[in-house]
Structures are given as C-alpha cells and as structure tokens.
C-alpha cells in the first residue's frame, strides 16, 4: 500500500521547475539593480514596503526583492549568489526545506527569503543550533540587512529581558532554538504584557533544520521549579537494579533497539521482596514502578562516555547526532536523576514542571516555517507529515567530484580499527588530510591512542574536548591534517582545502561505524567534496558495531563463517551485507520516527490545553477594562457546581450545611447566610440567592477600589495567580498520568487512548479548580485603599 504522505510529496522535477522559473524572473532584474547607486538600491526597501501595504503580495515582490538583496550581497560581502542559491531562496520563501550540499552557501542563500519576509514588519526569526553560529551569522549577514535599512537583533540564552525584548523588536532576529523556546514559555508565565519579550511567531528560517526539527524533537523544553526531595527513591531503586541478572529466565530483559529494559516475572518478585510490597503494579505503587523502570534503563540501556559523560561531578548528556555535550539539557521523567544515582554524583532535584513544550509543537505555531540543511531527503515523509514541509533538493553549482567508496566489513572490532589506522597512516604519509568520524567518545579516544603509538599527529574533537571546535574543523582540510571527530561536530563550519591538497585527492573521510541514521552518515560524507572539490569517503564496519549487534549480526556472521571469513583481518565487500546494514538503519529510523511521533501525540493533547490556557492568560493581561464579563460567569459556574453537588436526591436529603460552608469559605465574610435561610428553597432559588450575594460582594469591592486601574490590576492578579497555580499542578498531574498509562500498557490497554480520555477529565477538573480558587481569592480578599 502506498503511504498517503508519500503520495502528497511532489515529483522532484516538477518541484524544481517552478523554482527555476522564479530564478529566471530574479535574474532578469540583475542588470537593473546593478545600475543603481547605493542610495537608490537602499531606497528599494521602502519602495517594496509601500507596494506591500498597497496590496502587492510577497510572491509578487519576490523577483525584484531577491534581485535587490542579491546585489547588496555583492556590494557588502563581495559574494554574488549563484542561480542555484536563488532557487534555494525561493524554496525557503515557500515554507519548505532546501536541501543544499555542504559548501553550497546556505547562509548566503538565506539573505534573500529573510529580506523578503522582513518587509511586512512582523519579524523574521533565523534559528541556529548554537550561540556561536547565531552571533557569527548575525554579524556577517547583518551587514547586508543593515545596508538595506533593516534592523538586526541577536537573542542569547543569558541575556537580560530588556535586551531580549529589543532583539525581538527588530525586523530580523537571530537566535538558537532553545533560547527562543524558553523565551516563549517564560512569556506565558509573565504577569504583565510588559514583561514579555517575543513579539510574534511570524516567519522562521531554521539553519541545520534536520538537527532541530528531527534530532532534537524528542526532548521537550522544560522550565522547572523545586519540589519534594525524592533522591532516596532514586538511590534505593538504583541499589535494587544493581542486584539483578539479565536474561529472559533471569530478572530483566533489555531491548537494545528501543533502549528500554523490563523486569521479568522473577524480577518483579524480587522487587516485591526488596521493597516489601504485595504487588509492584498496584495503582498505589505506580511511582515506585517508575523509579525501578528508570533505574533499569539508566544502568542497562545507557552507557557512560557514549550517552553521557561525568564532568565536574555532573552527568552531562552527549547529543547522539552531533557528538557535542548538550549543555543545560536533562533527560525527563526522572531518567537524568537515575543516571546521577548510578554514577554516585549529587542527584539534582527533579522539581516540578512549571512549563514545557516540544520543539515540534513550538515551531508549528509559526505562520510560516522553512529550513535548510545538507541532508533531509531521507526524512521527507516525517517533515511532510509533522510540519507540512516539502524537501527540495537544490542542484549544486558545480558537479560533486567526491567518490563514495563501498563499505568494508570486518569480523571484529580489532580487525576494523587496525585497518582504519593503516589507512590513516597511508594517507598521512602522502600528506592527504583525513577526517575520521566516530559515533562515541570511547571510539575517538581509542583511535587517538592507536595513532599516538604510530606517531601520527592529530586533533581529537569530542564531547570532552570541544572548546576549539570551529578552529579545529576549519583546519581539517590542510595538508597532513588528521582530525578525529564524533559524529557531525563542526556542522556549520566549512572545511576548505589547503594549498596543493586538491592534487592529493582532496579531503578523505573515514567513517568508523554506521550511525543509526543514514542522514548522519550522509552528513559525514558531505564534509568532503565541497563546491566541486575532489575527495573520497569510506565506512569501516565490524560485526561487533552497535548497529550490527542490535540488528541481525548473527545472520551475517554465519554467512561470513561459511565463506571462511571469521578471523581478525577478514574483510568483506558484499552487496548483500551493505543492503542488510541499510535495512538495519531504516528500521532504527522507523523506530526513532515512531518515538518522535509518540512524543508529539502525547504533547498534542497538552498543546490544545496549553493554547487555551495561554490565550486566556494573554487576554487577561491585555485587558485595560474591568474583567467582570469573564469573572462573574466563573463565579456563577462555581456556584452551580457546588449547589448541584449537594442537592442530589430528595430535598430532605440535601446537604445544605456544605453549601453554607462554601459560602463562608469562598463567597462571604459576614456569615449572613445560614442553613435556615436555605431550608425550603428550590434548587434555582438557592442559586439566585448566592448569585445576588456574589454580585453584592463584587460591586462592593469595585466601590472600595474607586481607581479603575487598581480594580483591573486586582482582577488580573487574582485570575493569573489561580490559572498559574493550577496549570503547573496540571502539568505534573499529566506527567504522572502518562507514566501511569505507560506502565499499564504492559497489559492490553492502548496507552494513548487511555491518556486522551483521562486528560479530558483532568483538564475539566483543573478548570473547575481555577474557577473555584478565583472565586474564593477574589471574594475573600480584604481590600484596603492605598493612602496617598
């Protein structure tokens, strides 16, 4: 059956044709723009803005606007965008992903759509993967925008709010994904509109879009607060799981493919004895089951120096797609605390979640989203389904001359690494630069030791040593350079060939292991052969590589043994084996996509609720008039719920005392309503009596606060306090609910449907609690006039 998303993806030739037509139209204005003086060229910005206000669309302005900023690029930077870069710019303006090979000038390409989309004045955000690139691109490309009369802002994580606000007030703002994501969350915790910093989510252009939209999509952005100390539970769970034995007939099993671990029946029995409980999976033990599950995963599915490093007494995650340390990022659901318990370092409080959002749902809030990267085609179905973006492969300006050699496969790791070192030695002796890609810190350090023994000078770039990343990567194309880098360290920095290197064959790229994503392998290859340079790439693999162990190495091993290829130095170049490896990668990519999709499905439930709550907060903060029209209906609904709850059955059985208690606790300070006042009254009469009481109390406070602004601020404070308190509690409730349904999913339940159903009632209860608290806080507040 054909994937319905696949059917929606346009034919590549047809895609390119429409963008080539726009490039033709842009190039037709080249001479006209070149003939203008600087002042005349700069005046084009105001002309375009005026034409836009008078009804022309950005699509209609595109050819001239692109031609104008293209000419500005030439005058300011000395760089004139090629035709293929115009095509890339048109793809980006269309709200799609432009796949452009390494060295094809993505940053320069971006000047055209960024300039065009900044003309309406609603703000353009250019998002990068790190602060170095944010500042570098803003400084370099900012010269062009300033020349054309547009303002540029830079938003960094640690900036004070007034600087952030100024940055977002600019026509074009450069920022990292985490900085703007956290700004958005903090804006929706603000108490006044003046505290907010982000102006609007209009048009975003994402650099290294695959890294941000796909690789980072599983980890939500979380703003946390302090909570009860639960360190003891992490430590006890860690001590328990360290007593267990692995195996289906033992205590636990590990799913290496999914990076999960589960107790067997025998393990469950051991847990019940260890923790002195009757049934581990009773509802009352849901939290304990979660602690044990996270401890199992931390100890047996994640590994030091591969998934994380321990530095300065802290556990720091390694980004599996870049090899860098992910500063400030922590695993959610208690997994990070489980790492800390495992490693014996200080356990940092889990805290309550004050606000959270996935990057997927954050970027989907923009009116238009676009991105550029060197590799995205393998993920085009996901990008189409999640973000409604096409992936368009932009032609290279020069033909790619890099030669991608077939993989070579060894029986074991020793044979593979010996071959890698021999190949590096051969290339080093003739002066050809080598970039060696590794998947883990361990591998990079092992190779470094082997090269030291051979007397081969080299640089190592990994999560433990990334301070001079851009400098090391930039030098990797010089004669005789040998650079070992985990994954795609140095993305965004060009590797230019030194003098005479092209004659030696260009940059040689050696992969020491296939990554679980074909896209990351393609990125490593793409470091060589930029702008028509020569180069070559080859991957060296072994049956003991992680990917092979996880996916069917046994079958390949048997085949190699039948071919008498089972000693250290045996090497295989076999199409069937290469196909098996690609098949394994596709399986992992599918699993990772399923995981990201699951994260999105759960967060989509929260997204709908979050948008309602955040919109409500915004309306309250924006209000300059009394909020009576919002507040009094809240009070009436609260009265209805309380009265209805205590007037079921026959009238003689009504719980009038509880209604009076509600009045005393939430409506009135005078105690003027008693049970006797309610006796004999109908349900409707009781409600009307309480409505009247609430109205009198409301208008009494309005009279006491004769200053209109004071009254509005008082109403805002009460409402925002209630909303925030219960929303934060709701986030924690939803986290616990998700953990609970995931644990119960070991039965026959569909956890997502369970979650959606329970989330609806949990949300409704939160709304009821907000309205009750708003009623109580407002009505019982003692109003004192400010004395002047």
UniProtKB/Swiss-Prot annotation:
Residues annotated for ATP binding in this entry: 85, 103-107, 494
GO molecular function: ATP binding; protein-exporting ATPase activity
Source organism superkingdom: Bacteria
SMART domains found in the cross-reference section: SecA_DEAD, SecA_PP_bind
Matches recorded under Gene3D superfamilies: Helical scaffold and wing domains of SecA (1.10.3060.10), P-loop containing nucleotide triphosphate hydrolases (3.40.50.300), SecA, preprotein cross-linking domain (3.90.1440.10)
Chief subcellular location: membrane
Keywords, sorted A to Z: ATP-binding, Cell membrane, Cytoplasm, Membrane, Nucleotide-binding, Protein transport, Translocase, Translocation, Transport
Pfam family, one: SecA_PP_bind
Enzyme Commission (EC) number: 7.4.2.8
GO terms classed as biological process: intracellular protein transmembrane transport; protein import; protein targeting; protein transport by the Sec complex
Family statement drawn from the similarity comment of this UniProt entry: Belongs to the SecA family.
PANTHER family (alphabetical): CHLOROPLAST PROTEIN-TRANSPORTING ATPASE, SECA INNER MEMBRANE COMPONENT OF SEC PROTEIN SECRETION SYSTEM
Subunit and interaction comment: Monomer and homodimer. Part of the essential Sec protein translocation apparatus which comprises SecA, SecYEG and auxiliary proteins SecDF. Other proteins may also be involved.
Protein name: Protein translocase subunit SecA
Organism: Oenococcus oeni (strain ATCC BAA-331 / PSU-1)
Encoding gene, per UniProt annotation: secA
């Amino acid at each position: 059956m054909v994937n319905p998303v696949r059917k929606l993806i346009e034919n590549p030739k047809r895609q390119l044709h429409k963008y080539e037509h726009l490039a033709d139209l842009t190039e037709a204005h080249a001479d006209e723009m070149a003939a203008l003086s600087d002042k005349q060229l700069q005046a084009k910005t105001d002309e375009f803005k005026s034409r836009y206000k008078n009804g022309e669309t950005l699509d209609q302005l595109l050819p001239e606007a692109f031609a104008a900023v293209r000419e500005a690029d030439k005058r300011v930077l000395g760089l004139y965008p090629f035709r293929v870069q115009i095509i890339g710019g048109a793809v980006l303006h269309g709200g799609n992903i432009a796949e452009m090979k390494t060295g094809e000038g993505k940053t320069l390409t971006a000047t055209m759509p960024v300039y065009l989309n900044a003309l309406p004045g609603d703000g353009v955000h250019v998002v990068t993967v790190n602060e170095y690139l944010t500042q570098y691109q803003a400084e370099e490309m900012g010269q062009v925008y300033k020349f054309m009369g547009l303002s540029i802002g830079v938003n960094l994580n640690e900036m004070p709010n007034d600087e952030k606000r100024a940055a977002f007030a600019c026509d074009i703002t450069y920022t990292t994904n985490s900085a703007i994501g956290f700004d958005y969350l903090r804006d929706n915790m603000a108490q006044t509109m003046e505290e907010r910093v982000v102006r609007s989510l209009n048009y975003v252009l994402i650099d290294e879009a695959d890294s941000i939209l796909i690789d980072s999509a599983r980890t939500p952005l979380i703003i946390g607060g302090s909570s009860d100390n639960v360190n003891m539970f992490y430590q006890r769970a860690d001590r328990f799981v360290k007593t267990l034995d692995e195996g289906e007939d033992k205590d636990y099993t590990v799913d290496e493919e999914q990076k999960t671990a589960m107790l067997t029946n025998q393990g469950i029995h051991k847990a019940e004895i260890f923790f002195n409980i009757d049934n581990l999976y009773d509802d009352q033990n849901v939290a304990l089951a979660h602690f044990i599950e996270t401890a199992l995963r931390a100890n047996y599915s994640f590994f030091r120096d591969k998934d994380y490093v321990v530095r300065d007494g802290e556990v720091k995650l390694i980004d599996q797609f870049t090899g860098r340390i992910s500063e400030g990022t922590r695993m959610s659901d208690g997994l990070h605390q489980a790492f800390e318990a495992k490693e014996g370092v200080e356990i940092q409080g889990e805290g309550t979640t004050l606000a959270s959002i996935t990057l997927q749902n954050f970027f989907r809030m923009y009116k238009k989203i676009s991105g550029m990267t060197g590799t995205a085609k393998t993920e085009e179905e996901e990008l189409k389904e999640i973000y409604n973006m096409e992936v368009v492969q932009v032609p290279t300006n020069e033909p790619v001359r890099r030669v991608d050699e077939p993989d070579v496969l060894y029986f074991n790791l020793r044979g593979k690494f010996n071959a890698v070192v021999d190949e590096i030695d051969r290339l080093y002796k003739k002066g050809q630069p080598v970039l060696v890609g590794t998947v883990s810190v361990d591998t990079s350090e092992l190779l470094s030791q082997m090269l030291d023994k051979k007397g081969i000078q080299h640089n190592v770039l990994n999560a433990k040593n990334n301070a001079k990343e851009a400098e090391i990567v930039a030098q990797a194309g010089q004669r005789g350079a040998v650079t070992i880098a985990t994954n795609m360290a140095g993305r965004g920095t060009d590797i230019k060939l030194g003098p005479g290197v092209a004659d030696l064959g260009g940059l040689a790229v050696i992969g020491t292991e296939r990554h679980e994503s074909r896209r990351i392998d393609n990125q490593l290859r793409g470091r060589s052969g930029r702008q028509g340079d020569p180069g070559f790439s080859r991957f060296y693999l072994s049956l003991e590589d992680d990917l092979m162990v996880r996916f069917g190495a046994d079958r390949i091993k048997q085949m190699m043994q039948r071919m008498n290829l089972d000693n250290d130095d045996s090497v295989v170049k076999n199409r069937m084996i290469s196909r098996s490896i690609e098949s394994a990668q596709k399986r992992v990519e599918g699993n990772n996509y399923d995981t990201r999709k699951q994260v999105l499905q759960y967060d989509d439930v929260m997204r709908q609720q979050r948008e309602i709550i955040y919109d409500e907060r915004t309306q309250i903060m924006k209000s300059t008039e009394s909020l009576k029209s919002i507040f009094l209906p809240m009070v009436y609904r609260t009265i209805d719920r309380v009265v209805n709850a205590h007037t079921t059955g026959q009238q003689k059985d009504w719980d009038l005392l509880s209604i009076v208690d509600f009045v005393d606790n939430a409506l009135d300070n005078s105690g003027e309503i008693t049970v006797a006042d309610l006796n004999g009254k109908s349900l409707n009469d009781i409600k009307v009596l309480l409505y009247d009481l609430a109205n009198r109390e409301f208008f009494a406070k309005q009279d006491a606060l004769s200053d209109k602004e004071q009254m509005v601020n008082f109403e805002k404070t009460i409402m925002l306090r209630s909303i925030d308190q219960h929303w934060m509690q709701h986030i924690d409730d939803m986290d616990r609910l998700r953990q609970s349904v995931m644990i119960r999913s070991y039965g026959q339940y569909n956890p997502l449907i369970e979650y959606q159903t329970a989330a609806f009632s949990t949300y409704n209860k939160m709304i009821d609690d907000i309205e009750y608290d708003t009623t109580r806080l407002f009505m019982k507040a003692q109003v004192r006039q400010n004395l002047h």
